[in-house]
């Protein structure tokens, strides 16, 4: 087994791609929908490549630091997908993460969150991955559903179909 693993999680959202993009790439609001995560922008404007981020993932005072750099930032149009890529640069969390927003018409889109994780702890990390994967995936599914519900509710309240 390689020490790099992939974990993609898609969700369909009843809101336009541009609205979903604006919400998911508002890095400091990520804690509103991503379980156990707090993020702050540490460099750049947060709206493009070169932005640096510091996140803490955990419960209460117990958390794992996660430093990142945005290496790609392409906003969606009505017809083309948007994509943001971050490189995890921390001591524990390393790898790449991707947000992709694909328009499915004027009022709907698909958001896919993908992590390409470099497993820590060598052989122990590889042995533990089959146990950790379903837990991480379940957390991401809950988080993405929360994000989708928030975006859909905001769209309906503002000017939805």
Regions found by a protein language model. Name each.
Residues 31, 41-96, 108, 142-161:
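Glycine-rich portal/gate segments that line the openings of hydrophobic small-molecule binding cavities
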Residues 5, 15, 55, 86, ...:
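Residue-level detector of alpha-helix boundaries and kinks
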Residues 87-142, 158-161:
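Beta-strand/loop substructures that line and gate deep hydrophobic ligand-binding cavities in soluble
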Residues 10-14, 56, 69, 100, ...:
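Generic structural detector for well-ordered beta-strands
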Residues 1-48:
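Hydrophobic ligand-binding cavity/cleft-lining segments
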Residues 16-19, 139, 143:
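Short amphipathic alpha-helical segments
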């Amino acid at each position: 087994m390689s020490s790099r693993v992939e974990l993609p999680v898609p969700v369909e959202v009843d809101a336009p791609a541009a609205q979903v993009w604006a919400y998911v790439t508002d890095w400091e609001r990520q804690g509103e929908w991503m379980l156990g995560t707090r993020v702050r922008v540490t460099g750049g404007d947060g709206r493009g490549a070169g932005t640096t981020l510091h996140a803490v993932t955990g419960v209460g005072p117990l958390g794992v630091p996660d430093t990142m750099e945005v290496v790609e930032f392409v906003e969606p149009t009505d017809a083309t997908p948007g994509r943001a890529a971050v490189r995890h640069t921390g001591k524990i969390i390393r790898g790449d993460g991707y947000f992709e927003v694909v328009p499915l018409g004027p009022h709907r889109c698909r958001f896919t969150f993908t992590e390409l994780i470099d497993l820590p702890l060598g052989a122990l990390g590889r042995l533990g991955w089959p146990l950790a994967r379903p837990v991480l995936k379940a957390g991401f599914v809950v988080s993405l559903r929360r994000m989708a519900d928030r975006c859909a509710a905001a769209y309906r309240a503002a000017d939805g179909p």
